[in-house]
Amino acid sequence: MVGLTVAGLDYLANCAVYVLDRRTGREVSRSGIRPLHRPRFGDEPGVGALRASAGVGGGRVSIEVDDDEDTSSIRVQARGVRVRLEVSRPGHDSPAVVVPWSERRFQYTLKDLANPVTGSVTLDGTTHDLGAGWAVLDRGRGRWRYATTWNWGAGSGVVDGSTRALQVGGKWTDGTGSTENGILVDGRMHKLGDDLQWTYDVSDPAGPWRVRVSGWMPRSRRSICATELGVLAVKTHQAFGTWHGTGVLDDGTEVSLDGLVGWAEQSRNRW
């Protein structure tokens, strides 16, 4: 599994890459910050090019994205890590919502699920072919509150010959009237409008994460990432594995979500 981050917080930029080998449990994480810099994002996902780098010397992380009509080419370079990805964008539905906290504070978020991806990861000179997989884009803009906690989970795959994906979130949207939850089936997004109930124990490395309505995910691996820079702090618990359960579509049809590969997380942030 490969995770990439390009973030602009007005007063600094962050670029990060995370690689997990689910078979061996090996993890590689690189992250860099660049004070007083803002990455230049396009107005819409899938439009234009992105060039971002943060960190200095051997700690620099560089991420480049080039988009055409239906494909994104991604290149990442960091100490001991090189990533090359080709992501197809099928043009299916994606959940996009604005979460309001006040008249001046809000966050727009878009989750683009179940995008076919191929590519390779090179670690310390050894190249690993990733084969065929799934990519998720998490794109957001807005004005966050200084201290925020969120849950986020997603999974993609093919079940009974049908391409399906799951998107679930919580905590940061509670009480706002907005949710970012839904089930994607063969290109159509079915919205889950209610707040979801998350049950998990971050101190139990063998325990499952359960989400009411969508199902549950036994983890194959846990990642804990923490950054503490004075007023800036991030601590994220992530669980990687396979989702099991069912979901109900707009017309009342119950569908299986068994076998969707993805993750669930809790993240506490001070920005």
Question: What kind of feature is each model-predicted range?
Answer:
Residues M1-W271:
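Structured soluble/peripheral alpha/beta segments that form catalytic or ligand/cofactor-binding pockets
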